Amino acid sequence: MSDALNMTLDEIVKKSKSERSAAARSGGKGVSRKSGRGRGGPNGVVGGGRGGGPVRRGPLAVNTRPSSSFSINKLARRKRSLPWQNQNDLYEETLRAVGVSGVEVGTTVYITNLDQGVTNEDIRELYAEIGELKRYAIHYDKNGRPSGSAEVVYMRRSDAIQAMRKYNNVLLDGRPMKLEILGGNTESAPVAARVNVTGLNGRMKRSVFIGQGVRGGRVGRGRGSGPSGRRLPLQQNQQGGVTAGRGGFRGRGRGNGGGRGNKSGGRGGKKPVEKSAADLDKDLESYHAEAMNIS
């Protein structure tokens, strides 16, 4: 120990090199290995290699731990998706499962009569208030100028209908916007069908509106019946007046013998005859059969 204290730094380095070369030649046999905490031992003691080696103390006990051979994988930061994005993905997958392609998803609102100063940002700001937009664009002509039309595609059809009801004929930069939903009827309720029905005697002919079924028809005051509910078979009584079917009543119209002061002395002539359910069903079937013969 005293010899090491009297040696200079160069001599100590030279001696350590010679000891390491001798240990390498001997293969490290018979040399014990001391290990500390982790890769570096306590008090700077570093264990030898797999074949062992001399124990270094003092100033030369430098932590010569090699650089790590593995890299730390940074955790990939997952992009958080919004709840409505997951719902839209599920909605598109459902439509594809039933045979509807992804291009067909969404409802397009076609907008015309726009001022040339309207921009895409104006369209987005205005129509995004209604619901989620899939895409939006202003149309341009061949010269690159706005053509006065645009289209907005909503993810939900209900939003497109609401946008049409809210912004149709509304002024934007002094011009009323004209909106149209592409690819389907936009009416909330279907229009009643109108057919021409010929009466049983071949002389009576009128237009009948078939709606979504109010039970019990009604004949109005005019020659034609109004569009309120399903019209049941028109019948003729013995006095020539016109009566309605199940639950209906006869009006004051111009039916034969149906006016005021007829032979029966009442406003409607003879009262309708009570019929059973089977008779009414039979009359209804005959009415439908006659309705098919549209003249």
UniProtKB/Swiss-Prot annotation:
Residues 38-55, 213-227, 242-267 have a biased composition (Gly residues). One of its GO terms (biological process) is rRNA processing. Residues 11-22, 271-288 have a biased composition (Basic and acidic residues). PANTHER family: RNA AND EXPORT FACTOR BINDING PROTEIN (PTHR19965), THO COMPLEX SUBUNIT 4C (PTHR19965:SF86). GO terms for cellular component: mitochondrion; nucleolus; nucleoplasm; nucleus. It holds the Pfam family FoP_duplication. It is found in: Nucleus, Nucleoplasm; Nucleus, Nucleolus. Interacts with PARP1. One of its GO terms (molecular function) is mRNA binding. Residues 107-184 form the RRM domain. CDD domains: RRM_THOC4. The keyword Calcium does not apply. Residues 1-67, 212-295 are annotated as: Disordered. The modification N-acetylserine is found at S2. The lineage of its organism: Eukaryota, Viridiplantae, Streptophyta, Embryophyta, Tracheophyta. Its main location: nucleus. The gene is ALY3. This is THO complex subunit 4C. Keywords: Acetylation, mRNA transport, Nucleus, RNA-binding, Transport. Export adapter involved in nuclear export of spliced and unspliced mRNA. It comes from the Eukaryota. It comes from Arabidopsis thaliana.
